[in-house]
């Protein structure tokens, strides 16, 4: 794991220990899912995929819960927004990756 992934993993671990996060099913599942994806693969794509998933998940939670969010999740959100805002995520590259992943999962049909 690179340094960004390790830092994110440690922050996810701290967030999971937070009683507010543990009490909320959506946030605890999001943290576990993202931590699992980070440890499952060492590729840069896994980090990009995880921060995209976290950004969407935290944003939707924030908007649907009257703009209240646990501080540990806010820490993670501000950490990953640096990478997203700096353009470290190449959306075209991510789109091609997702298309390729989808095409690989489609069964081949021979006539």
From Swiss-Prot:
Keyword set, alphabetical order: Bacteriocin immunity, Plasmid
Top-level taxonomic group: Bacteria
Keyword Magnesium: no
GO CC terms: cytoplasm; plasma membrane
InterPro entries: Ta0600-like_sf (IPR023130)
Keyword NADP on entry: no
GO terms under biological process: bacteriocin immunity
Protein role: Could impart immunity to carnobacteriocin-B2 to naturally sensitive host strains.
Name of the protein: Putative carnobacteriocin-B2 immunity protein
Species in which this protein is naturally found: Carnobacterium maltaromaticum (Carnobacterium piscicola)
Organism lineage: Bacteria, Bacillati, Bacillota, Bacilli, Lactobacillales
């Amino acid at each position: 794991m690179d340094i960004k992934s390790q830092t994110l993993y440690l922050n996810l671990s701290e967030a999971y220990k937070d009683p507010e996060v543990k009490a909320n099913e959506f946030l605890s599942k999001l943290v576990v899912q993202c931590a699992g994806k980070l440890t499952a693969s060492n590729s840069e794509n896994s980090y990009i995929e995880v921060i995209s998933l976290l950004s969407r998940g935290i944003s939707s939670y924030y908007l649907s819960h009257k703009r209240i969010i646990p501080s540990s999740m806010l820490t993670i959100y501000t950490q990953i927004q640096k990478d997203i805002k700096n353009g470290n995520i190449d959306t075209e590259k991510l789109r091609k990756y997702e298309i390729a992943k989808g095409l690989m999962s489609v069964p081949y049909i021979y006539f």
